[in-house]
Amino acid sequence: MATKSSLDLRSDPRAMIGTREFDAPRDLVFAVFTDPKHLAQWWGPNGFTTTTLSFDMRTGGVWRFIMHGPDGRDYQNRITYEEIVPNERIAYRHGGEPDVEPVQMRQTIVFDDLGGRRTRITWRLDFPSAAERERVIKEYGADTGMVQTLTRLADYLAADTMQTERNFASGR
């Protein structure tokens, strides 16, 4: 059974750290971060959908996507991958397109194998300053959004883990 998401805003004033455990093996949890077809099923807060424009998941590669808000507003996003260690870690620089939203934050996701087909992820967002973190929380609801995104990921993995595993095994 997946536990509730936790969010740490206290240990570092420039960081936001989300944690959640999942009833799914580590390789599967990692895999749903590596395919835009699966990312589209869970990425973002409640009510959001995601359209991938380009996806190149390798060190130095870029994922460009649009998050469509429930209010009809579109949010351009750009992720540049800095480090990928399969089944263990993904680190990237995340922000909007430079001419639209210049904020850039470093994000690191660590995948911990808890045994028994359980995985914990720790998702850390490091902002350039405490003021920038507070601005992103105030303007975008990033704190609530992180918790909702982790919950959507848990729901996606729980919906049919065996079907998801079969889809990855067959390349769908």
Q: Whereabouts are the PLM-identified features?
A:
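Hydrophobic ligand-binding cavity/cleft-lining segments
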Residues: M1-T49, R172
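Hydrophobic/aromatic beta-strand elements that line small-molecule binding cavities or substrate pockets
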Residues: R20, T52-F55, N77-E83, H94, ...
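Helix-adjacent hinge/juxtasegments
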Residues: V62-G96
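Beta-strand/loop substructures that line and gate deep hydrophobic ligand-binding cavities in soluble
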Residues: E97-V147
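Hydrophobic pocket/interface hotspot
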Residues: V29, L39, W63-F65, Y81, ...
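A short, structured loop/turn motif at beta-sheet edges
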Residues: R26, M57-R58, E82-E88, V110-R120
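Short beta-edge strand/loop motif at the mouth of beta-sheet-based domains
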Residues: I17-G18, K37-D74, E165-R172
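Intrinsic-disorder/low-complexity, polar/charged segments enriched in Ser/Thr/Lys/Arg/Asp/Glu/Gln
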Residues: P13-T19, T50, V62, Q76, ...
